[in-house]
Amino acid sequence: MKIPEDIKKRIEKLREEIEYHNYRYYVLADPIISDEEYDRLMQELIELEKKYPELVTPDSPSQRVGEKVLDEFRSVEHSEPMLSLDNTYDEAQIREFDKRVRKLLEKDTIEYVTELKIDGVSVALRYENGRFVLGLSRGDGTRGDDITENLKKVRSIPLILREPVTVEVRGEIYMPTEEFERLNEERKKVDGPLFANPRNATAGTLRQLDTSVIRNRRLDSFIYYVLSPERYGLQTQWDALKWLKKIGFKVNPYSQLCQNIDQVIDYWKQWIEKKSELSYWVDGVVVKVNHFNFQSILGSTSRSPRWAIAFKFPAQRAKTRVLNIIVQVGRTGILTPVAELEPIQLAGTVVKRVSLHNFDYIEEKDIRIGDQVYVEKSGGIIPQVVSVIADERNGSEKKIEIPSKCPVCSGKVGKIDSEDVALRCLNPHCPAKLKRALETFVSRGALNIKGLGEKLIDRLVDSGLVKDIADIFYLTPFELSQLGSGIGQKMIANLLAQIEQAKKTPLHKILTGLGIPLVGEKTARILTQKFRSIKRLLSSSVDELTQIEGIGIEIAKNIREYFDNEKTRQIIGKLEKAGLNLEEKEAVVQSKILSNLTFAVTGTLKNFTRDQIKQLVQSLGGQVTDSVSKSTDYVIVGDNPGSKLTKARNLGVKLLTEDEFLQFVKIDIKNLRQQKLF
């Protein structure tokens, strides 16, 4: 069938428009259309390409949306080695670097370009006639993995440049702080291993063979290097940064041209103070000789260029002693080693415990009980042991043995597959797994049974009263009274009332509480909107699940594996028999007053929890996001607001108090309470 010419032209036009709007949004940070208008353009393109698949090209913007499951990453040789950088934390050493450069070049002063050192993953991107054809990881510096398909999901990487040049560039892929925190929060809810920092999260994301994982994690990029710059008439690094932005790449806006080393040091000191204001982690400043002809004269060693150096920020670091290393067992059986420390003050908080992530990490760092260690707060958030002070060992230190059995149930331990870094308890009846599963099930984001705390859960499981999560709905006053001291009649009555109330929990929260790996609240909402009942979800196939926007192959397999388990089906049957709400009717939106509006919330609200205000906004046709951007319409501000307020003010986003929001939507809080909606 011959394709009409006007269809071909429309598809080309749509691609050009979408790439132009990507450029304005990601590179210029100045969008001129709404998210809804952008989505309409993308949807039209997807539908046309679905109808005329022969017109689909590898560089079409639609390829960012589709999903692929790769067999493996092929290894490709870099056209030019990706070298590492020498680094220093010391002002005297940066002056020594400048002195050495000036001496070799026989110059009194040298122009430098200073760029923020992003805590991410280095990549090489190749374009032919302006079209993205290959993306490589750094690998060993000589060869890297072909991660082209994954990099296509990073929206700020252009698939078509604004000029038809053939060029290779290099840059950093990173995960914004809010996305990193969201991802770790999601993983915490489903008992997944947490990422230590955004760099690890980025690296782990880019290594995924299932491209849907990348699409569901918001990665970003900054490009900073052009291979063979003389081909494009570029004489300096400063010129190169301007040219990169001009042809469509996202370039860090905080780079600075410095006339001498004093200005470099001033820049470094300025960003030591200001780095916490950024929406991504940085760990220093990269200092580069500006002129390319000077770079050529200086050359490189086999490991690093002589014309550049990383000027690292001083870490928030403290010295302490490892008192003990204990092993915790999570809901899915993951064994996590935790260091108990002599308490230290670090970045305004007392640190007593630090996760050691896994046993490979302990072996790599050679951490022993009794060691003196340095603990840092990466990005000012997560404390971790970064190094051991081996010189201070006295011989009394003890190596921890990798467990050969579960510390709780003495069951077998092992790894699920060769790529699994986590050691797990393989006993399906391990009481530690059940305890953690119950904690997830009754947590605030799920059934929200406040009376079921950690200590009571321990007693219920240890006594044998609770053998699975559904058993809590069959507890009797007499059984609870037999648990011993501290369990009075009033407490029993309150607990049973809360358990009864929990039967009315919305389906998406029940799904969240089940703890299916990688299924957090967002995914649970998607599943609820699609299937509306547990029974329909139970009968869904992997293929059916992967057709749903936001559900990739890994999540789909986890869902299927979870519900295929006979024990799970028994639990679902018990929950249904107990009277839980396992079916959700179609939501009836009374008003569309917030249609097409996007909100964010910061601070503590007096009338609503975060979940309740989110539910209210959604019921009125609006959306609630976890972060503030130019596409956010309003930020609802409560008591003790966080960084979202500052960002909203900087972006000019409208602010509403809680009362102003209620007036805006014409809702009386008293009526809401009378209707028991909140």
From Swiss-Prot:
User: What does UniProt give as GO cellular component?
Assistant: cytosol
Active-site residue numbers: K117 (n6-amp-lysine intermediate)
Q: Which PROSITE patterns match?
A: BRCT (PS50172), DNA_LIGASE_N1 (PS01055), DNA_LIGASE_N2 (PS01056)
Q: Which cofactor does it need?
A: Mg(2+); Mn(2+)
> What are the top taxonomic ranks of the organism?
Bacteria, Thermotogati, Thermotogota, Thermotogae, Thermotogales
Q: Give the protein's recorded name.
A: DNA ligase
Q: What's this chain's function?
A: DNA ligase that catalyzes the formation of phosphodiester linkages between 5'-phosphoryl and 3'-hydroxyl groups in double-stranded DNA using NAD as a coenzyme and as the energy source for the reaction. It is essential for DNA replication and repair of damaged DNA.
- Gene from which this protein is expressed: ligA
Under the heading InterPro entries, the entry gives: BRCT_dom (IPR001357), BRCT_dom_sf (IPR036420), DisA/LigA_HHH (IPR041663), DNA_ligase (IPR001679), DNA_ligase_AS (IPR018239), DNA_ligase_CS (IPR033136), DNAligase_adenylation (IPR013839), DNAligase_N (IPR013840)
Q: Give one GO molecular function term.
A: metal ion binding
